[in-house]
Curated annotation (Swiss-Prot):
The keyword Transport does not apply. The gene is rpmD. InterPro entries: Ribo_uL30_ferredoxin-like_sf (IPR036919), Ribosomal_uL30_bac-type (IPR005996), Ribosomal_uL30_ferredoxin-like (IPR016082). The lineage of its organism: Bacteria, Bacillati, Actinomycetota, Actinomycetes, Mycobacteriales. GO terms for molecular function: structural constituent of ribosome. Belongs to the universal ribosomal protein uL30 family. Keywords: Ribonucleoprotein, Ribosomal protein. One of its GO terms (cellular component) is cytosolic large ribosomal subunit. This is Large ribosomal subunit protein uL30. GO terms for biological process: translation. It comes from the Bacteria. It comes from Corynebacterium glutamicum (strain R). Part of the 50S ribosomal subunit.
């Protein structure tokens, strides 16, 4: 199982830790989409920035 992650809000005014989490996920700008494996580490980063992103489950790796 993989996760499709799309950034929907910008990083202006957010905490540095949230910006670091977005960078670690590979997100750089609004409407940028990446596909990441469904691991506990990725889920933790998603939880921290859930107000800035949208997550969808996709089949495959």
């Amino acid at each position: 199982m993989a996760l499709k992650i799309t950034q929907i809000k910008g990083t202006v005014g957010t905490k540095p830790k949230h910006r670091d989490n977005l960078r670690s996920l590979g997100l750089k700008r609004i409407r940028h989409t990446v596909i990441r494996p469904d691991t506990p580490e990725v889920r933790g980063m998603i939880l921290a920035v859930r107000h800035l992103i949208v997550v969808e489950e996709v089949a495959g790796e």
